[in-house]
Every structure is written in structure tokens, then in C-alpha cells.
Swiss-Prot record:
Mg(2+) binds at D80, D122, K123, E448. This is Dihydroxy-acid dehydratase. NCBIfam families: ilvD (TIGR00110), PRK00911.1 (NF002068). Belongs to the IlvD/Edd family. The gene is ilvD.
Length: 561
């Protein structure tokens, strides 16, 4: 039986195509082998990606040994930490769409038979998965792996969150320049995705839970022999399943796989960005999946692992040592029906077979169900008159005293205004900070709010101030921070109608985000209201703002106008 790449290499009419392929070094024998795409994301400026060029070389060698013909291509990548707190963050979420489009373009333009994806950080992982789902060929993911936690001289573990929060302490005069410099130099000690349960590691963990990656993908450290061995196995597996209809990506990433991903997300208190990305991934997979389904999963899954930033002493390397994703899945599967164990993985095993025999090796890192941090998941979906279409909060990172909090609104119409206000002392205990016009359309690009949230924590206001935004948060954010408020202010959402001094309430147990203003008053405020429009000079961001949906739909690009 033929394979997809026969379209470009078989028959007399493809002589010109073969001629071009021979120019790249192919021989007669290669035209009888499967053509394997390698979507690499080597980018020098990203700590999790600067070494991926070597990983691509290793993967190509392994594919050749396994009987395939590798064709490597690259995607762009944005480092959210470096783009944070300035106009660069406008491009982070839109880059997900460019990455997805580039995967679809390269794979379909050249009729490749299978795909090996080598992502690592932030938007690159979901962007690759979205594009691969459109192509729907057998696909294996192997990320670059997480970095080690940093260590202070006394052995205290630190990470990127420590550095961001230290800025707030320095602004208050609670930390010297020398102390800040020591943290700066030690927070990110190696290559890899940042060491906590931030967005990159969350998405790599979820790829493992969905079965598109091999066991260990989410937790084995970067730049180690273990990670290299994992990459070699993934490359070989891409050749083994090339052309095998059973392993087409949409047969792996189905409703059961997406459910299992959210189970692990809830059990480990992943980044709130995972909600945005899983909604988009489900759409590309053709799976009906929304915020209500996510909340239903959260209600059934205990939160059994707290990882930085929720618990600063525990990092991804500790989760790996404690048994990794298989141990987490095995533990939550003890509550019957929670894990869909019949779901197929790229190795040919079911999830149930993959986790059989897994065990928790350190119960201080992964708790048994009986000692869960909470009986429900580490993420929650909120609704209410301030978020009729939903909002998301990382409950794993909220202090107990802030799970129900009412504060007086102090409103900012951009992240930059908010940072200036916080640094300038405008935000006081008892305030509920509202940052609006930062949604997918209004930003545009739905900036991450790590800078303002870190300033709030670093200034010691974490148990006295809450924050709500139509933007989103870094996985490194902690505190009573509600994001993805939908509809966003730029499309006339209620967030745009809030005024300074209004009483705003977050109630995690009630799953509610509300403003204590009568409906009649909100209606009066809406009369004559026009959302603010920011001047957008970039042609790409203009197109993005015109076509993007709001966060409740995954901030995907609309294809029907």
C-alpha cells in the first residue's frame, strides 16, 4: 500500500520532483522509504530552545537508522519571559497561530508521511499540536525538557517567579541591588523550559497525558542522557508508525485524550493558559469541549501535586523523581472512571497499560488522594455578571484567605497603566485591580500579566489585593488572579463598565466573579458606551484583532466571517 509521500516521488510524471529531491542528497533507495517531517523550534534567544538544533541532528540520525528519510524545518518561537511587561508580549499568543499555520503549510505542501515535533516552551507546544491536527498524519512529540531549579547559596530552590517577585521587593526598598543580582544570576541555571509548573511544562505534561508523547516527556530534565534517549525513541517511533492509519493524530487526540489531559492539569494545578490552549486544540481535533466540560473535570479530580509557583520548594525535577505523569495518572485513576484508560497512545499502549505499575515514589511531592490539597482540581472556571461567558483562575496558587474576597475596584485600561499604578503606590490593601482592554482583540494579543501580579506579591499585597483581567497570566503567576474574563472589554464585556470603587467579588467555592452593581445601573452605564480602540500599527496584529475569537473559545482565529 502506498504512503502519502508517493504523491511527490512515484511515477514518471514525478521525475522533476525527484530531480529536486536528489539535489538535497536523496538516492534511488530513499524513494521507497517514508518521508518524516521534523518540526523543530530551535531559537537562540529562548533558554528552552537554544540547544534544539543539536536535538534535531540527533533525531535525523535516528530516523535514518530506523529506515526513514528526515526533512527538518523550523518554526518561530517567542520567549514569554523576555517579551513580558512590554510591547513584545502583544506577539506571544498570536505566534501560536503562525506556528500552527507553518506546520500545516510545510507538511501538506510536501506530502510528508509522519511528523516528529520538537517544541518546548509556551505557545510553541500548542501551536505545533494545532497545526499537526490539521495535517492528521501519525505524529510524535518530544519536547526539549525542563531546566533545573536555581539554588541560592543556602540551598533554597528558586526560579523565574523568584526573579519577577524580587523586582517588587526591590521597588519597595526591601531588597538590595546585590541581592537582586544574585537571584538574577541563579534563577535560571540551565537550558530548558522554566522549572516550575508554568505554561511550557504544563503543556509538555499534557502532551504526555494525551498520549502524543512518550512517558517522561513532561518531566525528564533537558540536556541529560535520559532526555536524549527519549528523543531517540520518539524519532524511531515516528518512522514505525508512518503511514499507519491507526496512529493518525486525530485518532490519538480525541475526546478521551483531551479529558485525560485536563485530569492531569487539575491534579497538578497547571498554568491557566492550558485552558486557552486546550480549547483551541479541541477545536482543531473536532472535539466538542468548552469551559463547562473543564469545570466538570475539575469537580471530579483531586489536586494532589503542588509545584512552583504554587509551592516554591517543589519543581518539575521533583515530580519526575516522584514518579512523573504516570504516577499522577495512576493515583487519580484510583477514583474509578476519572481517567479514560482505554485511550490509545502513540506507543501503541493504552493509557491504562502505560500507567500500570506506576507508583508514587515521594509522597511529599505527589500526595495520595486521601491527602489531596483539595478534593477538586487546581484550576477553576468562574461565571457571574462580570464574566457571563466565563473566566479562569488557578486555585492552586490562591492563599486560603483569598478564596473569597471582596475589594474596591481600581481600574486600568492597559497593563502598562497597571504596572505604573502599582509601582506608584496607587494600589492599596483592599483593592480589586481591574486590567482591561488586554484581551485577544483588545490588546491585541492577550498579554500575560506576570509583571503586575509579581509586583503585587513582591510588595506584600498578595493576601490583601485581587486582580481580574480579560488578559491572561504566565504560568508563573500566583495569587487571587482571575484571567480570560469573557466577553472581553473590547467587545463590550461587563469588565468595561466597572468603575473605580465598585465592589468586586471572587468566590472560588461558588465559582463566581461578580460586581455588586444593580443590573439597572449597568444598563445605564452601557447607554452610549463605546469600547476603547487602541491604535494598531502592525499589519499582522491588525489582522489578528479582526479575526480572533475571545478567550472562552480558545482565542482561535475565525475562519468564517
Amino acid at each position: 500500500m502506498g504512503v502519502r509521500s508517493d504523491t511527490i516521488k512515484k511515477g514518471f510524471e514525478r521525475a522533476p520532483h525527484r530531480s529536486l529531491l536528489r539535489a538535497t542528497g536523496l538516492t534511488d533507495a530513499d524513494f521507497d522509504k517514508p518521508f518524516i517531517g521534523i518540526a523543530n523550534s530551535h531559537v537562540d534567544i529562548i533558554p528552552g530552545h537554544f540547544f534544539l538544533q543539536e536535538y534535531g541532528r540527533i533525531a535525523k540520525d535516528e530516523i535514518r537508522k530506523a529506515g526513514g528519510v528526515p526533512f527538518e524545518f523550523n518554526t518561530i518561537g517567542v520567549d514569554d519571559g523576555i517579551a513580558m511587561g512590554h510591547a513584545g508580549m502583544l506577539y506571544s499568543l498570536p505566534s501560536r497561530e503562525l506556528i500552527a499555520d507553518s506546520i500545516e503549510t510545510m507538511m501538506n505542501a510536501h506530502s510528508l508521511d509522519a511528523l516528529l515535533c520538537i517544541p518546548n516552551c509556551d505557545k510553541i507546544v500548542p501551536g505545533m499540536l494545532m497545526g499537526a491536527l490539521r495535517v492528521d498524519v501519525p505524529t510524535v512529540f518530544c519536547s526539549g525538557g525542563p531546566m533545573k531549579a536555581g539554588r541560592m547559596a543556602d540551598g533554597t530552590a528558586i526560579d523565574l517567579t523568584t526573579a519577577f517577585e524580587a523586582v517588587g521587593k526591590r521597588a519597595l526598598g526591601q531588597m538590595s541591588d546585590a541581592e537582586l543580582y544574585e537571584i538574577e544570576c541563579k534563577a535560571c541555571p540551565s537550558g530548558g523550559s522554566c522549572s516550575g509548573m508554568f505554561t511550557a511544562n504544563s503543556m509538555n505534561v499534557l502532551c504526555e497525558a494525551m498520549g502524543v508523547a512518550l512517558p517522561g516527556n513532561g518531566t525528564a530534565l533537558a540536556l541529560t542522557p535520559e532526555r536524549e534517549a527519549l528523543l531517540r525513541r520518539a524519532a524511531r517511533r515516528a518512522v514505525e508508525i508512518a503511514g499507519d492509519e491507526r496512529f493518525r493524530l486525530r485518532r490519538i487526540v480525541n475526546a478521551d485524550a483531551i479529558h485525560n489531559a485536563m485530569v492531569v492539569d487539575m491534579a497538578m494545578g497547571g498554568s491557566s493558559n492550558t485552558v486557552l490552549h486546550m480549547l483551541a486544540i479541541a477545536r482543531e481535533a473536532g472535539v466538542e469541549f468548552g469551559l463547562r466540560q473543564i469545570e466538570a473535570v475539575a469537580a471530579k479530580v483531586g489536586h494532589i501535586a503542588k509545584i512552583a509557583p504554587s509551592l516554591s520548594t517543589v519543581h518539575i525535577e521533583d515530580v519526575h523523581r516522584a514518579g512523573g505523569v504516570p504516577a499522577v495518572l495512576h493515583e487519580v485513576a484510583r477514583r474509578g472512571g476519572v481517567v479514560r484508560e482505554d485511550a490509545l497512545t502513540v506507543t501503541g499502549e493504552t493509557v491504562g497499560e502505560r500507567i500500570r505499575g506506576a507508583e508514587i515514589k515521594d509522597r511529599s511531592v505527589i500526595h495520595p488522594l486521601e491527602e489531596a490539597y483539595s478534593a477538586v482540581g487546581g484550576l477553576a472556571v468562574l461565571f457571574g455578571n462580570l464574566a457571563p461567558e466565563g473566566a479562569v483562575v488557578k486555585t492552586a496558587g490562591i492563599q486560603p484567605s483569598m478564596r473569597k474576597f471582596t475589594g474596591r475596584a481600581i481600574c486600568f485600561d492597559s497593563q502598562e497603566e497597571a504596572i505604573a499604578g502599582i509601582m506608584g503606590g496607587k494600589v492599596k490593601p483592599g483593592h480589586f485591580v481591574v486590567i482591561r482592554y488586554e484581551g485577544p482583540r483588545g490588546g491585541p494579543g492577550m498579554q500575560e500579566m506576570l509583571a503586575p501580579t509579581s509586583l503585587i506579591m513582591g510588595m506584600g499585597l498578595g493576601e490583601q489585593v485581587a486582580l481580574a483581567t480579560d488578559g491572561r497570566f504566565s504560568g508563573a503567576t500566583r495569587g487571587a488572579c482571575v484571567g480570560h474574563v469573557s466577553p472581553e472589554a473590547a467587545e463590550g464585556g461587563p469588565l468595561a463598565l466597572v468603575q473605580d470603587g465598585d465592589a468586586v467579588t471572587i468566590d472560588v467555592e461558588a465559582r463566581a466573579l461578580t460586581v455588586d452593581v444593580p443590573d439597572a445601573e449597568l444598563a445605564r452605564r452601557r447607554e452610549g458606551f463605546r469600547p476603547k480602540r487602541k491604535e494598531i500599527r502592525s499589519s499582522w496584529l491588525k489582522r489578528y484583532a479582526l479575526l480572533v475569537s475571545n478567550a472562552s473559545a480558545g482565542a482561535v482565529m475565525k475562519t468564517e466571517l
